[in-house]
């Protein structure tokens, strides 16, 4: 069966994924699927760096504002709903363009996971990270202990097999129905960190404090409140730290998050990054997309 072609724009926060995704959607008749675990929440617009109303008018966005703030959202939900969105976009004769930085969600979708029951996102993530920390010798020893045989011995297949063994029918693996063009965006580290710092300042100017205070007053313990952009401000609202310290912590956590995102995409999804500082980088990406879509 012919695989469905997907374009995926990935990379660290603040690198410019949203703008590129919209440009590709306009150029190649596409619609965007958000691959971000926080942008699903209604009323949380600033802290999640959600595409603005003006940006959403330029290209239709799926999986934005699909949950109330007090609802949970998991990798199970994302895979299920992203597949529906992909089918919807394809039925219109358009190209699905997935834009986001939540690596676990994207990897689970692209690598053929389908879920027979709900797997707790944090449980899956913790188990995968535990396996990733093992040496090759220890990892393959675990395969032997559980009598797991895989046709080709490499770390990715080994980890996938152990996940399937642990979670059973809740996390099944089959051949992916998708042919994915992964476009990884990156920038010089200091340039990226400076952009992150400026974006946090802009978020504060645009009303992040009011948005976070509303969450603090109404839903301080829900899953959404644990996201970067909100949890750092809660100690300020409870008068434990001054605002300047809270904002500095938010910038620091965002920079660290960007570093973790890069590590995930490099090590777990084999993404080759394009530097946004390169001359004509968007034109290079468009040529790559055009070649991908025209190939059989």
From Swiss-Prot:
Gene Ontology molecular function terms on file: ATP binding; tRNA dimethylallyltransferase activity
InterPro entries assigned to the protein according to its UniProt record, in alphabetical order: Dimethylallyltransferase (IPR039657), IPT (IPR018022), P-loop_NTPase (IPR027417)
Keywords, in A-Z order: ATP-binding, Magnesium, Nucleotide-binding, Transferase, tRNA processing
E.C. number(s) listed in UniProt: 2.5.1.75
Listed cofactors: Mg(2+)
Cell membrane among keywords: no
Residues flagged as site, Interaction with substrate tRNA: 102, 128
SUPFAM superfamilies given in the database record: P-loop containing nucleoside triphosphate hydrolases (SSF52540)
Example of a GO biological process term: tRNA modification
Pfam families: IPPT
Annotated binding of substrate, by residue: 13-18
Region (Interaction with substrate tRNA): 36-39
Amino acids binding ATP: 11-18
Catalytic activity: adenosine(37) in tRNA + dimethylallyl diphosphate = N(6)-dimethylallyladenosine(37) in tRNA + diphosphate
The family this protein is said to belong to: Belongs to the IPP transferase family.
Function description: Catalyzes the transfer of a dimethylallyl group onto the adenine at position 37 in tRNAs that read codons beginning with uridine, leading to the formation of N6-(dimethylallyl)adenosine (i(6)A).
HAMAP family, per the entry: IPP_trans (MF_00185)
Subunit-structure text: Monomer.
Protein name: tRNA dimethylallyltransferase
Source organism: Streptococcus agalactiae serotype III (strain NEM316)
This protein's encoding gene: miaA
């Amino acid at each position: 069966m012919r695989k469905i072609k997907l374009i995926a724009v990935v990379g660290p926060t603040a690198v410019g994924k949203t703008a590129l995704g919209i440009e590709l959607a306009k150029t190649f008749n596409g619609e965007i699927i958000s691959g971000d675990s926080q942008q699903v929440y209604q009323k949380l617009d600033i802290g999640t760096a959600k595409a603005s109303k003006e940006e959403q008018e330029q290209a239709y966005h799926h999986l934005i504002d699909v949950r109330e703030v007090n609802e949970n959202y998991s990798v199970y939900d994302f895979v299920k709903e992203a597949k529906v969105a992909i089918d919807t976009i394809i039925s219109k004769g358009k190209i699905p363009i997935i834009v986001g930085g939540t690596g676990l969600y994207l990897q689970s979708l692209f690598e053929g996971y389908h879920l027979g029951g709900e797997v707790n996102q944090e449980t899956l993530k913790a188990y995968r990270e535990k396996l990733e920390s093992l040496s090759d010798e220890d990892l393959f020893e675990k395969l032997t202990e559980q009598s797991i045989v895989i046709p080709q011995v490499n770390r990715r297949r080994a980890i996938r097999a152990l996940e399937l063994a642990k979670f059973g029918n809740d996390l099944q693996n089959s051949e992916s129905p998708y042919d994915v063009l992964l476009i990884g965006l990156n920038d010089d580290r200091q340039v990226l960190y400076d952009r992150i710092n400026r974006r946090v300042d802009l978020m504060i100017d645009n009303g992040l404090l009011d948005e976070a205070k509303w969450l603090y007053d109404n839903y301080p313990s829900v899953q959404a409140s644990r996201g970067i952009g909100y949890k750092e401000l809660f100690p300020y609202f409870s008068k434990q730290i001054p605002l300047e310290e809270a904002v500095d912590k938010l910038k620091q956590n965002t920079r660290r998050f960007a570093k973790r995102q890069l590590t995930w995409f490099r090590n777990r999804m084999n993404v080759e990054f394009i530097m946004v500082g390169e001359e004509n980088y968007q034109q290079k990406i468009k040529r790559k997309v055009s070649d991908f879509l025209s190939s059989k």
